[in-house]
């Protein structure tokens, strides 16, 4: 199974074997660094004049002159841009079409239209239901944990690709989507109404002994607000220690991470990004507020990206112990830049680390 890149974007989305691609399809199907700069076509025009692109121009001319029917120039360009980025062989870099980019932005904000399930992508490219939200459209339609989504409106999900499948299942609130599922060898058809749903990415409770427990499933645009409400309530209720559960948290936005770390760490620079020319940039900093409670972070092999930086920051600043299994080991950062077509490029641009530690990319956070 593949893991959602939930590439830590700048705003902080897989290397070895890409872990389970997880998303909140709400279906609960990821910045601060989304750079809204429309320079893509200008870059292409400059490159197109270079000799190394001569064969590509020849190929395009041959196709235009000899293909047996009309060529859809827009579709060809979209495919070419996807292929160009795919040639980097980087699972975190991708080109998104306009529709895919809109779905991406909605998901990263923590607000989406969907059916109320959490899914993972199988090796075959289908979507397996990991959790069905209570009182969600999916639950009302009879969907169950373990169901495999294979088709949407008659189209094969594996052929649509991950982003295409999410986009097809989502849609306008109040409309109905037809899904084909596999359950214990049987094929079922379900009609599910799409609804507006807010993704819950932070939740918590008080455990025995006045231990505050906070589960963070990802770092979305709405995560800091959810986290702060839980954190404040636990502290006000007299928590004597805090546990942060980041198991299976694939990461998310650095802007969300920074806001969550702010009340926990001392004032100053917390994490930096290092670019290929050796220059550095402050990624995370904190003000003078600092949590004095004992803290513990729980992690596993699917704890990645922003979730790893959260863990490393608390550990390296001596604020928390870490328990569980070694983490995934993703210490590289992506930025997402909009393109003139309405699509977007997500590109790996830097490594990152805490100011008190070393970059752990591919080296894991060991327990």
Report the location of each language-model feature.
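Cleft-lining beta-strand/loop regions that shape enzyme active-site pockets
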Residues: 14, 43-48, 130, 139-141, ...
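Extended, small/polar residue-biased N-terminal targeting/export presequences
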Residues: 67-128, 176-178, 184-191
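Conserved small/polar residues in nucleotide/adenosyl-binding loops
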Residues: 365-367
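Gram-positive cell-envelope targeting signals
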Residues: 1-57
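Acidic/histidine-rich, surface-exposed loop or edge segments in extracytoplasmic proteins
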Residues: 58-66
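PDZ/PDZ-like domain segments forming the peptide/carboxylate-binding groove
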Residues: 29, 66, 110-151, 155-159, ...
